[in-house]
Regions:
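Active-site proximal loop and beta-alpha junction motif in alpha/beta enzyme cores
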Residues: 1-149
Length: 149
């Protein structure tokens, strides 16, 4: 528990359509120790998906390092979660002191499971409020299917 939170960041629920419990941790080491606790989050809490994140080392090519767990819906860990990155825009607007304009925050996710993904997150701040977000990244097709109705 002593590893939870850093700077102004505290655990919170944020959503860009899908609610995520956003859990800041103090270091990459604490992030590496994170593991899903099946049943720990109930729908009454408002989120069953958990996005655990830490600020990256100053020498890293990314701003934040993250992991996403959703065992309640059958996802042990996800290597890249665009919907969580979109919700993370709200975290940045709330807990970072951002000047007006566009800001870029690359997020490394999936490294602990051997599937590192770099998600590009850009946020726009106007008059101190979040007014826009853009998510970018590359994907690898892992399956394909056809649904006939």
């Amino acid at each position: 528990e002593s590893d939870i939170g850093f700077d102004k960041h505290i655990p919170s629920i944020f959503s860009a359509g899908v609610p995520f419990a956003m859990i800041p941790v103090a270091s990459a080491e604490a992030l590496g120790r994170a593991s899903p606790a099946h049943g720990a989050l109930s729908p009454a809490l408002g989120a069953t998906e958990v996005f655990v994140y830490a600020r990256a080392d100053g020498n890293a090519a990314h701003s934040f390092h993250a992991r996403m767990f959703a065992p309640e819906i059958g996802i042990v860990e996800d290597p890249a979660t665009g919907s969580a990155a979109a919700a993370f825009a709200g975290v940045l607007a709330r807990f970072e002191d951002l000047a007006d304009g566009w800001h870029t925050f690359p997020i490394l996710q999936g490294a602990e499971m051997g599937r590192p993904s770099l998600i590009g997150l850009e946020v726009n701040i106007e008059n101190g409020a979040l007014t826009g977000a853009r998510i970018a990244g590359k994907a690898v097709k892992v399956s394909e299917g056809v649904l006939y109705v």
